[in-house]
UniProtKB/Swiss-Prot annotation:
Biological function: Catalyzes a trans-dehydration via an enolate intermediate.
This enzyme's EC code(s): 4.2.1.10
InterPro entries according to UniProt: DHquinase_II, DHquinase_II_CS, DHquinase_II_sf
NCBIfam families named among the record's database cross-references: aroQ (TIGR01088), PRK05395.1-1 (NF003804), PRK05395.1-2 (NF003805), PRK05395.1-3 (NF003806), PRK05395.1-4 (NF003807)
Positions annotated to bind substrate: 73, 79, 86, 100-101, 110
Organism: Prochlorococcus marinus (strain MIT 9313)
Catalysed reaction equations from the record: 3-dehydroquinate = 3-dehydroshikimate + H2O
Top EC group: lyase
Gene: aroQ
Active site: 22, 99
Protein name from the UniProt record: 3-dehydroquinate dehydratase
Alphabetized UniProt keyword annotations: Amino-acid biosynthesis, Aromatic amino acid biosynthesis, Lyase
GO BP annotation list: amino acid biosynthetic process; aromatic amino acid family biosynthetic process; chorismate biosynthetic process; quinate catabolic process
Subunit architecture: Homododecamer.
Keyword Amino-acid biosynthesis: yes
């Protein structure tokens, strides 16, 4: 099984940007942890980060027929990007939306997601652990899609 992890804008600054919201782990450390978890599950995981919306859309398009699921932390694009929503819907690949911080405990403009209503699930507020929980949930869905979790 192959999965894609997408990280959006400013996530390359993890570990130095607002650690009170996002924690002290770098994106590289989070990815290394998730790659180890994926390997233990016999899953191939590709990681990609971009600050550019179009690059994320391109990755989703390239994933069609190549991956069975997507983990996406779209960062601020979660609240603004109809293009990412359309790409995910067009690709028809199951995805889990994830966030380090609890977006509903933050500014009002972060309460709306253009991605959540079509996601398999949403994980937020657990810091770096959100990535592990999202992977676990996506794998459970892909391995037993008919079972209500």
């Amino acid at each position: 099984m192959r999965l894609l992890l997408l990280n959006g804008p400013n996530l390359n600054l993890l570990g130095q940007r607002e650690p009170g919201f996002y924690g002290a782990m770098t994106l590289k450390a989070i990815e290394a942890d998730l790659l180890a978890q994926a390997e233990a599950e016999a899953v191939q995981l590709e990681c990609f980060q971009s600050n550019f919306e179009g690059a994320l859309v391109d990755q989703i398009h390239q994933a069609i027929g190549q991956v069975q699921g997507i983990l996406i932390n779209a960062g601020a694009y979660t609240h603004t990007s109809i293009a990412l929503r359309d790409a995910l819907l067009g690709a028809a690949i199951p995805y889990v939306e994830l966030h380090l911080s609890n977006t509903h405990a933050r500014e009002g403009f972060r309460h709306h997601s253009y991605l959540a209503d079509r996601a398999v699930g949403v994980v937020s507020g657990f810091g770096a652990l959100s990535y592990r929980l999202a992977l676990e949930g996506l794998l459970a869905h892909l391995r037993q899609p008919q079972q209500v979790l």
